[in-house]
């Protein structure tokens, strides 16, 4: 656009008020057409929503797998080696990174697309993925499986079963608080190995709490318009 205007000015040799007004009008029309065309460029919303579904399905699988491993220890009480889990974990990490890139691309390619929500969503899942890895690390380091592991496994299944974009996690946080109170009320183990394993289990539970708190904060940070548009709630 600037090149066109400069060409006109050089061709004219001199510029009167009428010429300046004409060039200003040309600039206005050209810019306006560009903006309108940009507004109607198909956004990447469909691709991002597809990425969201893929990411959520992977989270559900990982949480369910973690619950199963925690609730069904090996013959000597040790946790499984988790090789299958690691493959799922790697796939989820890649999906989250790809989803975040798509959200940024949507922001760059369209003026009207409300990518603030998508960027916040992908940021949420990225942080939750990091927590999930730390949680898994806590459980895998347990040399024996405490009795309380079954309760935590049930909670993980609850999280997996209700894992969804529109879940604000408030009910799950209440359930988690109940599990924490149960664990605190039980006597401490005598043997060192049992003590360390229960401590790791509790650390994993605290990571799960942070996992849910992030979702609660994400939900509370949404505007009414975002809830209506992206969650379908008025």
Language-model segments: which ranges?
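Heme-based O2/NO sensor domains and their adjacent alpha-helical segments
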Residues: 131
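Pore- and pathway-forming membrane helices of multi-pass small-molecule/ion transporters and channels
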Residues: 1-35
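Extended alpha-helical interaction modules
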Residues: 24, 37-40, 50-55
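Membrane-water interface at the C-terminal end of transmembrane alpha helices
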Residues: 33-45
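Long, hydrophobic alpha-helical segments that serve as membrane-spanning/inserting helices
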Residues: 47-118, 123, 134-234
